[in-house]
């Protein structure tokens, strides 16, 4: 079903054998994390990722929503959002809620980023501080771009070095825009950190992730820590056979 690879103390990769396995693993992990949080603490606080892959995962979650113990205990936030002028065409919020609406999460527990407001980042940080106990999310979902960015933490941008703020507007020169994003300080303290990669378009990225020497560190590689590792879920088509063969046997574990 999957191969577990321990890259280092801060990163653990689970490579699914098929696209179906990839979605099943991601869905099971999400629902299991939600149910454990609801059972232990009475609620599930999650920060969602944008991108195409999470939308597929959301579809699987909706199909299996009967397995969620109590959808009324879910509190939904976003990890990042596009500039206001792109909202209608590419809003992470709109795309996600078009699917997740079937979970019937109370509207008062769905927190959208307002990128049109110049102080939207401060407002969103205050919402997190008000509603998320100790500002610790139960789960933060992360996508990964071909340049190694995650959320809207792009290579070479100022938000990568933010030490105090939980949410900021980040200027992204390579896209000629700015985006609102969570920062490392709040992401790293989440109880469960998980990144998703799938598709042949990410093969070069995966090659670099598996061969980190001689290059700059990607933003996504700065998320996990030895005390709170980042769990990766990958589809088999994003990893070349030759790259997997390079991994020492003692770092791999076949799982069924």
Curated annotation (Swiss-Prot):
Keyword Iron: no
Keywords: Hydrolase
Superkingdom assignment: Bacteria
Catalytic reaction annotation: 6-phospho-D-glucono-1,5-lactone + H2O = 6-phospho-D-gluconate + H(+)
Function (record text): Hydrolysis of 6-phosphogluconolactone to 6-phosphogluconate.
Family designation: Belongs to the glucosamine/galactosamine-6-phosphate isomerase family. 6-phosphogluconolactonase subfamily.
Species of the source: Chlamydia muridarum (strain MoPn / Nigg)
GO biological process, one term: pentose-phosphate shunt
Record EC number: 3.1.1.31
InterPro entries: 6-phosphogluconolactonase_DevB, Glc/Gal-6P_isomerase, NagB/RpiA_transferase-like, PGLS
Enzyme class name: hydrolase
Molecular function, one GO term: 6-phosphogluconolactonase activity
Record protein name field: 6-phosphogluconolactonase
Entry-linked NCBIfam families: pgl
SUPFAM superfamilies: NagB/RpiA/CoA transferase-like
Pathway where it operates: Carbohydrate degradation; pentose phosphate pathway; D-ribulose 5-phosphate from D-glucose 6-phosphate (oxidative stage): step 2/3
């Amino acid at each position: 079903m999957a191969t577990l690879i321990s890259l280092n103390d801060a990163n653990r990769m689970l490579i699914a054998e098929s696209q179906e396995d990839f979605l099943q693993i991601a869905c099971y992990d999400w629902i299991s994390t939600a149910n454990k949080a609801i059972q232990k603490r009475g609620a599930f606080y999650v920060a969602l990722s944008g991108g195409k892959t999470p939308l597929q995962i959301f579809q699987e979650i909706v199909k299996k929503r009967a397995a969620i113990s109590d959808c009324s205990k879910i509190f939904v936030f976003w990890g990042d959002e596009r500039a206001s002028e792109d909202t209608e065409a590419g809003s992470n919020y709109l795309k996600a809620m078009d699917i997740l609406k079937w979970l019937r999460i109370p509207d008062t527990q769905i927190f959208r980023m307002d990128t049109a407001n110049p102080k939207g980042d401060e407002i969103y940080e205050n919402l997190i501080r008000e509603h998320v106990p100790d500002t610790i999310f139960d789960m933060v979902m992360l996508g990964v771009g071909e340049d190694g960015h995650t959320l809207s933490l792009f290579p070479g941008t100022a938000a990568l070095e933010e030490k105090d703020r939980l949410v900021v507007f980040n200027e992204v020169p390579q896209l000629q825009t700015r985006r609102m994003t969570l920062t490392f300080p709040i992401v790293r303290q989440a109880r469960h950190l998980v990144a998703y990669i799938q598709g042949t378009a990410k093969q070069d990225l995966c090659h670099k992730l598996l061969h980190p020497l001689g290059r700059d560190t990607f933003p996504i590689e700065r998320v996990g820590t030895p005390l709170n590792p980042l769990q990766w879920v990958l589809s088999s088509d994003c990893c070349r056979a030759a790259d997997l063969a390079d991994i020492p046997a003692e770092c791999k574990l076949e799982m069924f």
